[in-house]
Swiss-Prot record:
CDD domains: Phosphoglycerate_kinase. One of its GO terms (cellular component) is cytosol. It comes from Mycolicibacterium gilvum (strain PYR-GCK). Pathway: Carbohydrate degradation; glycolysis; pyruvate from D-glyceraldehyde 3-phosphate: step 2/5. GO terms for molecular function: ADP binding; ATP binding; phosphoglycerate kinase activity. This is Phosphoglycerate kinase. The keyword Cytoplasm applies. InterPro entries: Phosphoglycerate_kinase, Phosphoglycerate_kinase_CS, Phosphoglycerate_kinase_N, Phosphoglycerate_kinase_sf. The gene is pgk. It is found in: Cytoplasm.
Amino acid sequence: MGIKSLDDLLAEGVSGRGVLVRSDLNVPLDGGSITDPGRIIASVPTLKALSDAGAKVVVTAHLGRPKGEPDPKFSLAPVGAALGEKLGRHVQLAGDVVGSDALARAEGLTDGDILLLENIRFDGRETSKDDAERLKLAKALVELVGDDGAFVSDGFGVVHRKQASVYDVATLLPHYAGTLVDTEVKVLAQLTESTERPYAVVLGGSKVSDKLAVIENLATKADSLIIGGGMCFTFLAAQGLSVGSSLLEESMIDTCRTLLDDYGDVLHLPVDIVVAEKFSADSEPQTVAADKIPDDKMGLDIGPESVRRFSALLSNAKTIFWNGPMGVFEFPAFAAGTKGVAEAIIGATGKGAFSVVGGGDSAAAVRQLGLPEDGFSHISTGGGASLEYLEGKELPGIEVLN
């Protein structure tokens, strides 16, 4: 792909120039405290390189899903403080997105300074379906860095969105892929274009409908496709099994039956399930065979025999993609499935396999369960973007950089 990199921009020279960076700083918060700083840490290399080179750096990012207007609970203030801490330098926070405070602060930047704009989604034009509205916001963002400025796309978690700060600004400024986006695209290309076999895919999460396109796409490419998490129950139901009060997408049962008919030699389902009476951390766990789930109980994790079988498949793999937990890993009693599969992937990686964790809940599980992040070849910052790439979809935020 003909995408210019951050190194290209640095070679051209950025000292004294305004550089607009779209980062992905959408981290989970609990009462104002950041519970997983992974995306903040991942954004540091690009921002540090630009600051060190003397650029006047203006960062735009979103947090959560505000409704197109300022909302204090979605302010980037705690994120800005954490970002400054990780960078080891002061990060200014503008009081607005492209208003008078942002403009005044941008004009006052000196070489190497970093300004973080307030949550870009406080401006409804960011996510507008109206091209003209998005373009107006993009032009206002460009004004903050000047006509001789540049745009660096470094928020991989949003490149599947056609939004003002992701797509439209790249049509107005010289544009480059940041370190993170550059790495992510190369990693995903390795999964799709130069895959060493055997290729194992592990998919979890709650809904088949969320993963249907990627299942259909990867089932034709993978040697084994392991299904866990809440969505396994719709597959079990498609086999005619009772799943008790487990999560079930009835509208997807026929689709799952077709997938099993077409790809039964590739798809692997759990053979035992950890069940409980209710969705609660203090529910009493009980392990049962997958065809013996009681009517009054719900599945909250895969069982130990499933972990053993899945681990055997993974131990021989040369390429592994994992997206989605095997169970409710947030509850310790139902975390063993996710941890066991993750440890098997780490073991395979140690033997030379190329492993990618596809962002989202999987990345959160790695950190929450205390697993070594360097035990995997790559942990993606973009769950949805990774899946859409592997579905074969064009990502607007990548295509516009070409």
